[in-house]
From Swiss-Prot:
Signal peptide positions on this chain: 1-24
Family: Belongs to the pancreatic ribonuclease family.
The species this protein was found in: Cebus capucinus (White-faced sapajou)
Name of the coding gene: RNASE9
Protein name per its UniProtKB record: Inactive ribonuclease-like protein 9
Task of the protein: Does not exhibit any ribonuclease activity.
Biological process, per Gene Ontology: defense response to Gram-positive bacterium
Protein keywords: Disulfide bond, Glycoprotein, Secreted, Signal
Record bears the keyword Ribonucleoprotein: no
Amino acid sequence: MMLITTHSLLLLLLLLQLLQPLQFQEAYYEDFYFPAYRDKEDFEDFMVEFQSTGPTRPPTKEKVKRRILVNPGMPLGDSGYCNYQIMRKNVYYKYSCVTEHYFLLMQYDELQKTCYNRFVPCKNGIRKCNMSKKLVEGVYCNLTKASNIPLCQYNSFYRRGYVLITCTWQNEMQKLIPYTINDLVEPPEHTKSFLNEDGVFVVPP
């Protein structure tokens, strides 16, 4: 049985990053042409977190933009969307595949404003989340097969709904910033509903 060492795994990740522009340069727009890490600082930040044995580093604006937000290009309904984007953006937890993830087609400023919206229940019913006031397009990724990273396999589900997020205080910016994406809630079908101030769907009489 061949053992995959940390050194060989990192070399594999580097190779995949170099190959991606060649594989997708004719298929999609600019966001899908260049490797995810466009400068040395971004890549070094990824390597430190990847090799760390301690807790996950706190989120930053650039990290949220890099791992969660996407630009127009590859169709959001593509069945291979998550497999490609997870690998391209290096969305892993240490040496493991993440069990689920969300990609959102929106600007960072709009997502950050959501941190100041009213609290609503999260999908787990425990923590408090903030809900966007507008519908957001995105993709929900659900892990179906876990192997040695980066060869994680996902089902991709297109969604258009209200995004639920948790936020945290960022000392350097002196602002609340997005921390995790909890859910992308699709509005009820075949009803003319709207959100009240408490973030609850209401159907007019």
